[in-house]
C-alpha cells in the first residue's frame, strides 16, 4: 500500500514541464528587456488543504469496497436507489435486483453470440470477473469485439436470470457511439432506439423506457453523473477506450471512483482498451483488500511484421551519427528516409524472380506510409522525394498527403491506387494512427515524432510542441501494416533510444491542456473545491495550473472572485455564467461570446461564430489555395469587416440559404469548390449550431421576439458583433506597433517617392542600368497571378533607385457606385492586399532583361527615347500645365459648380472662371456639322474612344468606358463625360463620332473640371461600414450642390485631387457632417499637410508677387505635382533577354506588425495565422495616428516561447478610444489613472484586481495597460458602469440556486438601455490628448481615499462598478505656460534656417526641424490641444 499511497501523493512533482510560473509553456528568456515589467512572473501557491489528506480520505472510501459473490445479491432495485446507504444496510449486504420478466417477454433475445471473435474465448472469464469484482479491466486488441460483445454478454446473463439491468457504454467519439449502437441493433434484430440506443450531446435516439444498453459519448455520462451524484441509475458502467485519457475521461474516472466508494458500491464498472496501462488503472481502483482483475483478449497477428531501427540498417549507406536527443528532423533525416524508399524499391525488384508477385504488382500493393509530425514536415519530405525523382526518372512515386486540414476530396486520394507503374507514398501526420486504414500499405517509415498541444495556464497561450511520440503511438503506427500481407516498419531512431528513452504512454490531456472544463465540472459536482477534486485524478495537475485556471475562470465571469464573500486563491463560487459555460461543449470564451450575444440580442450570430471557431479548417488548405485566387474567398465572406469571425457567420448564412434554394446535392459541392470552403466542416458546423441552439433553449437562452424597436440594423450589427467579440475574447487584445514612431507618415511617402501609399507597392533589387522602362509590361504581367489586369497598373521608376513602383489605377466603375467583389477595410485598395499576398506566397520574382549595351543598341535602332552620353532618357509625356483646370497655389477659395458626386470622398467641381470657355465648347459640339457624324456600326466604338454623347439636351465630349453586352440586338455603351465627371449608359443613336479636326484640337485638352474630396473628415465608423460614406452624408452634399454655385476652400492639392472645405450660410459642410455623426474629424495625410503648409505660405506672399511671376510659380507648382508617367513600351523579345533579375517584393510601406497588450506578451513578437483575412495587415488609414485594436479569438505560442500567433482575428472599428472603452466595459476591474495634476485621465490598468492589503495583483500575467490618446471623461465612466450593471442584471438572481428571473419584458428594457448607452458611448466626438509615459504603469495603486462606488449586487457582481477620481480644473499658471509655448512654436513657423530641436509641451512631442514643426501644428492632436488650453492664434 505504500506504493499506492505514493502514487496518489499529489504533493509529489506532477509537472507539465520544466518551465517557470507553473506553466506548460513560456520561456523567461524570451523577454528582451530587464525592466521590472519584463522579468519572469512568479507566484507563490498555497493550497487550502493538504493534498495528502484528500487522497487518504478517498482511499479510505475505496477500502470499503469489497469483492466477492455477496455483491451479486441485491435487496433493492438499483435504478430506484439514490444511494446504497439510504437504508443504512450493512456493508456487505446488497439489494436484490428486481425481476424484469415483462421486458424480456416483449423483445426477442438470441443468445447465440459470434464465436469467431477473439473476445468470445474469454467470455466466461469476463463474466466471472464482473460477477465477483466491482471494477474489472479488459485489455483487448482492436477488432477483438470487446465494444460490441461484452455489453451483450452482460445483457444475456441478465436475460437468463430475468434480472433488471441497465448498461451504459461510453465512446470517445460521437460517430463511434452511433455506429456501434446501430451495429448491435442490427446484429440482435432490435428496432433501433428500443433495447439498444445511443445519445450524443443532446441528441437521443429515443426516450424509450425499454433501453437497457445505451452507447453514449464520455461527456454525456459525465454530465449525467454530475447531475445525479450517484451511479445507481445504472447496473453496469462500461468505459471504453480509457487509454485516450482526455479530460472528460480522466474526470469521469474521478467521479466514478468517488461515487463508487461513496454511495454506489454495488454498481459494476468495466474499463476497456486496446492499449491500456493496466498497472496504472489497477492501482487507481485498488482497495486495501483487492486489486481489479485484468482480462486480456488477443487474436494474434495473421501476417508477420518486422521492425527495424536506425542502428540496425547497416546495409544502408548513411552517416553513423549518435541519436539526437532533441526532437526534430534534420536534413540528413529526410535524405535517409528517401534512401529507405530506394532500398524498398531495390529489394522488391530483386525479389521479382523469387516470388509469385511481379515487381509491378509489388509496387502497386507495397505502398509506404511515412509518419511526420506536421504539415511543414510533410512539404519538406515531399520536396526531397521529388528531388530524387527528378534526378532518377526510373523512380516513379505518387506522393499523397494526409493531414487534418485536407479537403474530403483530397483524403480520398489516400485510398486510391497509384498511377500505373508508380509506388504510392503517403506522407501523414498522426491522423493515420487510428482514424484511417489503408489496405495496400506494406511499409511504415516512422520518425517517432508528434506535435502535441500544451497550454501555458498563466498566459492561456497554447503551444504546439514537437515531441518524441510515445511507444503506444509507435505501436499503433506499426499496426497499420501486416493486415493483408507481411509488413515492415522502419523507426528512424536507434533501438536503445526507443527502448530506454522514449515514454511508454503520452502525457494525459489533463497535464497539458486547458483545465477550465474540468474545474467547472468540479464546481458543479459540488463535493469539494477544484483543487480537492482534481487532486483525485489519475494524473493530478499541479496546484499552480489549477490556480491559474481558477483565475482565468474568474476573468471570464465563470467564477466569482470569492467563496461566501471571502477571497480564495484556489476557488470561487460558481456564477450563472459558469453554469452556462459548463453546459456548452465549447471553450469558455466561445461560451462567453454566446452569453454576450444573448445579452446584446444577436444570439444566432454568436452561436454561428462560436460553432465556426470550434470546427477545424472551414476553408480548404493546400497547394491550390496558396497559388490561386481561392484565398480571396475569405475576403469575400468577410465583406470588408476585417474579421475572420464575421466571415464564418456570413459563409454559414450563405450556405444555409443555398441549401434551401438549391435542392441538388451536386450544386452544393460545386459551390463549396468555387468558394474554397470545406463542405465537410460546414456540415459539421451546421450540426454544432443545431446542438448549441438546443442547449441554449434548454437554458432558456432564446432571441427576443422580432420587433423593429429591438432589432439591429445592418450598419449597427457590424459594430455590435465587434463589441461582443471584444467582450468575449478579452484580454486577447493587440495593437499595431508603428503608429507611435516619429515621422512615420513622412517615411511612408519617402519610401515610395511620393506616390499614394493606398494604391502603390514596390519591388526592390532592380539594377538601374538595365533601363527599367523597357520592361513595364513585363512587370505588369507579374500581377496576373493575382488576377490584376495590366491596364489597371502603372509602373514607374526613380532615377538611380533600385525600386520599381507599381501603382494601381482607380476603377472607372466607381462612377456607378459599384464596389469591388473583394472588399477590404479602410482606404487601401484591394489590389495592394493582393500584391502583398503574392509576396507572402513567393517573396522572389524573376524578370528577364537585356544587358546594358544590347539595350542601348535596341532603343537606338527603334528610336525609343533619347540616348545621351551613353545614358538612355525614356520617352515621357510633356505636361501642358497651363491647360490644367486645377486650383492655383495662390487661390485659397474658388467659386463654381459641383458637376457630379460619387460620394463625399469623390466629386467633381467646375470653376466659375471656366463658364465662358465651357459654353463656347458646348456651342461647337452641338453645331450641325459636328452632330452629322452618326454612328452607323457598333464595331466602330471601342473602349477609350473619345466622342460626343448626349448629356441632357446637349451633346458633350465623352470617353467610352465599356461596351455593354447586347440585349434585344440594341447595343449600349457606358460613357464618362470628360468635362463633368458623370457617366451614362447610352444607345448608339445618342452618340456622335468626332470629326478629325475636332478630335485633334481636343485630344490633349485636360478635363474642364477637377476631382475633389472633403478635407479634415472621413466616414464615421459608427454610422458607416468599411470606410464608405453614409447615404445621408452624400445626400447633404447633393442637396447643397443642387442649390447652384458654391464656394470651396482648397486645403491641399495632391495627385491632382483637391481636399476642400465647403462653405455654407451657417457654417462649413465638413463640420456639419461631424455634428450629425455622419463623419468624424480626421488628420490629413503627410503629403496633404505638406501641400497645405506650402499653399498658405505662398498665399501670405501673394500681394507681394506680380501676376506674371504668380503664373510662373503656379505652373512650376503644378508641374511638380505631376507624378512620373508609365511609359508602357513594347518590351524587347524574350530571346534577346539573356539576363535574369530576381526582384524582391512587392512591398507596401503600410505593412504592420502587432504587439500584445497583455503583460505576459509584451516582449514577444506577434504574427497572424496565414489563413486569416488579416494575414496581410496594412495600415488602412495611414493618416490616422490612433491605435486601432485587433482582437484574437485564441493565441498560440511558438515552440521557443518567443513568438505568439493570433488566430481568429477581428480588426476593431476605427473609433477613437474604442480599445480603451472595450477594456473598461468588459474587464473584471480596472484603475483609471490621472496625470499628476489630476486634470485628465491618461492611462488605465485593467485586470482581475489586487490584494487590498499588499497591493499585489491577483493575475498579473493578464494585467493590461492602455495609454489613452483621446479624452475619456467622468461621464464615460458613468455610462460604462450603467452598462456593466445592466449586463449583470440580465442574469442576476439573489437566490443563487434559482434561475435568473428576468422575463421578456425585463430583457427588452435592459436591451434598449444597453443599446442607447452604447450608442452614446461610441458616438462621441472625442478630443485628442497628449500621450503620457509611466514608469510604474503595472502597479495597482491604493485608492482607499476614493469613495467606493455603490455596488448594487455586492460581491455577486461579475462586472463590479469602476471607481475613479474626480478631475480638477487646469491650473491657470500651467495654462499660461502652455499658451506661451504654443505662441513660440508659431513664431518659429516662418523661420527658414536651421532650428534646434524644440518641445511641443501641449502634445509631449519633440520637433527636430522647422518642417516637422510646421506639419505638427496642422495635426488634429495639436489643434485639439490648442482648444483645450484656450490658445487662439492672433
Curated annotation (Swiss-Prot):
Residues 66-86 are annotated as: Disordered. It is an enzyme of class 3 (hydrolase). The keyword Nucleotide-binding applies. One of its GO terms (molecular function) is ATP binding. GO terms for cellular component: cytoplasm. It is found in: Cytoplasm. A motif (DEAH box) lies at residues 240-243. Pfam families: DEAD, HA2_C, Helicase_C, TUDOR. Residues 938-1001 form the Tudor domain. CDD domains: SF2_C_RHA. Transmembrane segments: none annotated. Keywords: ATP-binding, Cytoplasm, Developmental protein, Differentiation, Helicase, Hydrolase, Meiosis, Nucleotide-binding, Oogenesis, RNA-mediated gene silencing, Spermatogenesis. This is Probable ATP-dependent RNA helicase spindle-E. It comes from Drosophila grimshawi. The lineage of its organism: Eukaryota, Metazoa, Ecdysozoa, Arthropoda, Hexapoda. The gene is spn-E.
